[in-house]
Curated annotation (Swiss-Prot):
Keywords: Aminoacyl-tRNA synthetase, ATP-binding, Cytoplasm, Ligase, Nucleotide-binding, Protein biosynthesis. It is an enzyme of class 6 (ligase). GO terms for molecular function: aminoacyl-tRNA deacylase activity; ATP binding; proline-tRNA ligase activity. It comes from Shewanella woodyi (strain ATCC 51908 / MS32). Homodimer. GO terms for cellular component: cytosol. This is Proline--tRNA ligase. The gene is proS. It holds the Pfam family tRNA-synt_2b. Consists of three domains: the N-terminal catalytic domain, the editing domain and the C-terminal anticodon-binding domain. It is found in: Cytoplasm.
Length: 569
């Protein structure tokens, strides 16, 4: 491809509204352009990368025995009503009506549609197991789209769905999808980690996420230093306390704390150890009888909202109560709330259950209680795992300790069980002629998100550093002063032809542009290999080669350049 015939829309300046490096570089490299909040057009450079990732995903799905189909982005709302997700999914589900006042949704996922297809097309055990996939645009009306294509409202996704009559074939397909995802990320040239995960709004039992490792990742991954255990922090089980509750040594006392609105301020101003404090958080309950619920964790711990949501009394989706409701129920505002005397249900973390002589809000503004003890000052509350695991704690697998790293989720696989098939009456006849409800699996890859994740992991201060497999072009040709030197022009044209004939994707910068601009653009868009041609190179009979990732430069004889670039890493 000649740059003169190409849309190379690079920018020198970093856009002010781009928060993360992938968003900045995708805009600067001319890969995408914003049309509206969370909506982007893919320009040629970005689309070439997107299509390469899509091709690798498709190849690995085909190898794993999945069969490609294509489902509509617009879905009948009736299917979502069947599964109960029309209301449960929340405002991320874009609902609308057609001219006949029929309800539709813009698909954020396709469980309902695929289950509807299978219940109509599959009626015998002889047609199972069945694994179907598509690569299709999705839409989720994110409350705050951000980070470019990392969290956009419209995105490209590969979603696969498998159907089974028995757990054995379900497990086999799940394992094949796990391996396919590992193969995809390996072929893309990305460092990644599969982790045990929560099933979220899709539901189901077993679940794994696939994370591209990057310091900018939104997700925290907890992994064992002594085994292959790894889990999303939302799912990682915190260790049970090993100590027993100590004896009470203090009387409970009410203390004025006018300047202590946070745990940190309470610790600093009143000399209490943070391990002897608790945070009491008021959240929405799941019933009319208990519209508010109190959750209590140790002052140095962080609430895990995913774990908390699994308590039956807690509203799903998880939501904190607003201050007006808190004051009406408790008589005080956030920062002064504690478990003593609360008239709403109280649930505590396991770590809180073994605390003694601890401090908490007094349910009066600007006051705290010190020297609180269970069963003396308040009844023992029901305990759950409500917190995030902490680096250095014992791993849930029993081997090693926990370390934390950041990742970007690009894939998620689930064993859904019968969640959707039961709701939609998806049954087939087994070998005995008896109707059986189908088991389902679900397997998603964020194709467009992978582009951003790859950049987050592969860049420097000059631009993107693409892995070879997904680079928009493998080689860039930079002819110096081509428009003033016929020798350089002829040599560049011949090299362009030779590389193209050899099946190597080339971007030939034939612009009448300064060398500095040409070099900057090639580094910005991240081509793995660059060949420089100048009069001095021609005199010496060599091309100047530069490797984008290593910065290595070397001279390559004219007659060796094609084979050299074929094997260059």
């Amino acid at each position: 491809m000649r740059v003169s015939k190409y849309l190379l829309s690079t920018q020198k300046e970093t856009p002010a509204d781009a928060e993360v490096i992938s968003h900045q570089l995708m805009l600067r490299a001319g890969m995408i352009r914003r049309n509206a909040s969370g909506l982007y057009s893919w320009l040629p450079t970005g689309l070439r990368v997107l299509r390469k990732i899509e091709a690798i995903v498709r190849e690995e799905m085909n190898k794993a025995g999945s069969v490609e189909i294509l489902m509509p982005m617009v879905q009948p709302a009736d299917l979502w009503v069947e599964t109960g997700r029309f209301e449960k999914f929340g405002p991320e589900l874009l609902r609308f009506q057609d001219r006949h006042n029929r309800d539709f949704v813009l698909g954020p996922t396709h469980e309902e549609v695929i289950t509807d297809i299978v219940r109509k097309e599959v009626n015998s055990y002889k047609q199972l197991p069945l694994n179907l996939f598509q690569i299709q645009t999705k839409f989720r009306d994110e409350v705050r789209p951000r980070f470019g294509v990392m969290r956009s409202r419209e995105f490209l996704m590969k979603d696969a769905y498998s159907f089974h009559l028995d757990q054995e074939t379900m497990d086999e397909t799940y394992e094949s999808m796990f391996q396919a995802y590992s193969n995809i990320l390996t072929r893309l040239g990305l460092a990644f980690r599969p982790v045990i995960a929560d099933t979220g709004s899709i539901g189901g039992s077993m679940s794994h996420e696939f994370h591209v490792l990057a310091n900018s990742g939104e997700d925290l991954i907890a992994y064992s230093t002594g085994s292959d255990y790894a889990a999303n922090i939302e799912k990682a089980e915190s260790p049970m306390p090993t100590q027993t509750r100590g004896e009470a040594t203090q009387e409970m006392s009410l203390v004025d704390t006018p300047n202590a609105k946070t745990i940190a301020e309470l610790v600093e101003q009143h000399g209490v150890a943070i391990e002897k404090t608790v945070k009491t958080l008021i959240v929405k309950g799941s019933s009319e009888e208990a519209p508010l619920v109190a959750l209590v964790i140790r002052g140095d711990h962080d609430l895990n909202e995913v774990k908390a949501e699994k308590i039956p009394a807690v509203h799903a989706p998880f939501e904190f109560a607003d201050e007006a409701d808190i004051r009406k129920a408790v008589g005080a505002g956030p920062g002064s709330i504690g478990p003593v005397g609360l008239e709403i249900p109280v649930y505590i973390d396991h770590g809180v259950s073994v605390m003694s002589d601890f401090a908490a809000g007094a349910n009066q503004d600007n006051k705290h209680l010190f020297g609180i003890n269970w069963e003396r000052n308040l009844p023992q509350a029901e305990a759950f795992d409500l917190r995030n695991i902490i680096e250095g704690e014992a791993s849930p697998c029993g081997q090693g300790t926990i370390a934390l790293l950041r990742g970007i989720e690009v894939g998620h696989i689930f064993q859904l069980g019968k969640n959707y098939s039961e709701a939609m009456n998806a049954n087939v006849l087994d070998q005995n002629g008896k109707a059986q409800t189908l088991l389902m699996g679900c397997y998603g890859v964020g194709v467009s998100r992978m582009v951003a994740a790859a950049i987050e992991q592969n860049h420097d201060d000059r631009g993107i550093i693409w892995p070879d497999a997904i680079a928009p072009f493998r080689v860039g040709i930079l002819p110096m002063n081509m428009h003033k030197s016929h020798r350089v022009q002829d040599m560049a044209e011949q090299l362009y032809k030779d590389l193209s004939d050899a099946g190597i994707e080339v971007l030939f910068d034939d612009r009448k542009e300064r060398a500095g601009v040409m070099f900057a653009d090639m580094e910005l868009i991240g081509l793995p290999h660059v060949v420089v041609i100048g009069d001095r190179n021609i005199d010496a009979g060599v091309f100047e080669y530069k490797n984008r990732r290593t910065g290595e430069k070397q001279e390559v004889p004219f007659d060796q350049i094609v084979e050299f670039l074929k094997s260059a890493q």
